[in-house]
A protein has these predicted regions:
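Negatively charged, low-complexity tracts enriched in Asp/Glu with abundant Ser/Thr
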Residues: 1-30
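Acidic, low-complexity intrinsically disordered segments
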Residues: 6, 45-85
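Short strand-coil-strand connectors
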Residues: 14-18, 40-42, 63
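A short, structured beta-strand/loop element
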Residues: 27-54
């Protein structure tokens, strides 16, 4: 029986000129591993993002994200790699 490690962490990532706390949680689904990421904006609205592993790179599935989140997405893959080592 395989043991699946629960991965959950927070990372401060600079977006829109300030540090924001992005919360990452990994789940293992039928189609492979998925990271669920959430972050809140200045008004307290929470955004939920799903990342899937494609060609050894974590890619965002959601469209129409605010520009400051799209700007931060490039930092997600290194943050995940750092935790999984």
């Amino acid at each position: 029986m395989a043991v699946l490690k629960n991965v959950q962490f927070s990372k401060l990532i600079k977006a829109e000129g300030r540090l924001r706390e992005f919360n990452f949680r990994k789940s293992n689904g039928i189609a492979g591993p998925v990271y669920h990421v959430d972050v809140s904006d200045d008004r307290g609205n929470r955004y939920y993002i799903n990342l899937h592993l494609e060609d050894n790179t974590w890619t965002v599935q959601e469209k129409n994200l605010p520009p400051w989140i799209q700007e931060a997405v490039v930092q997600f893959h290194p943050a995940i790699q750092e935790q999984e080592v």
